[in-house]
């Protein structure tokens, strides 16, 4: 990718937090167990994704977490606090509309931090238009709909194992390839 290319990082904060809490930890994450979002941007910068515009989608239907919003702004994320009075999944709808707008434009690649299969049609459309599309999350919890897009060129990056976005090792069990197996981690 060239420096002129723009890559949009879209973070589905609700999905990442819910997956971390319910599927990985089995409880609400403590603040020191949450991703270090600055490391995500550092990883992207070090891996030639061109110019990055980072959007962090938040459900602000009940309230807006101002301390977190201020932290996001300090890390060069643009918070997108969405609200609705209906039963809509506000963050999902906001991200879907954003993906559709990017697909309708002449350029723009996407990195999506989410496990949610609801974004499959929009990501497929981007891939079919030749855009670079990457999903960040916990690989073992990625929806089948998104996983199937790897046949179309979707790249998957693990939030913990590849980006190293956490200060603590998470209690995850996953398949270990022999070339990465380190017996000392089990002794």
Where does each model-flagged region fall?
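Nuclease catalytic cores that cleave nucleic-acid phosphodiester bonds
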Residues: 62-187
């Amino acid at each position: 990718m060239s420096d002129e290319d723009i890559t949009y990082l879209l973070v589905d904060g609700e999905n990442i937090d819910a997956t971390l809490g319910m599927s990985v930890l089995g409880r609400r994450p403590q603040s020191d167990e949450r991703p270090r979002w600055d490391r995500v941007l550092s990883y992207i910068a070090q891996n030639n994704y061109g110019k990055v515009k980072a959007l962090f989608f938040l459900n602000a239907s009940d309230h807006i977490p101002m301390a977190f919003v201020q932290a996001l702004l300090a890390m060069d994320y643009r918070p997108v606090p969405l609200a609705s009075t209906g039963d809509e999944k506000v963050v999902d709808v906001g991200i879907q509309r954003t993906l559709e707008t990017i697909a309708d434009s002449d350029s723009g690649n996407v990195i999506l931090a989410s496990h949610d299969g609801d974004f499959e049609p929009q990501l497929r459309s981007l891939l079919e238009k030749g855009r670079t599309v990457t999903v960040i999350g916990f690989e073992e919890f990625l929806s089948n709909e998104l996983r199937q897009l790897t046949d179309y060129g979707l790249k998957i990056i693990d939030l913990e194992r590849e980006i190293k976005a956490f200060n603590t090792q998470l209690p995850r069990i996953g398949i270990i390839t022999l070339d990465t197996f380190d017996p000392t981690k089990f002794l």
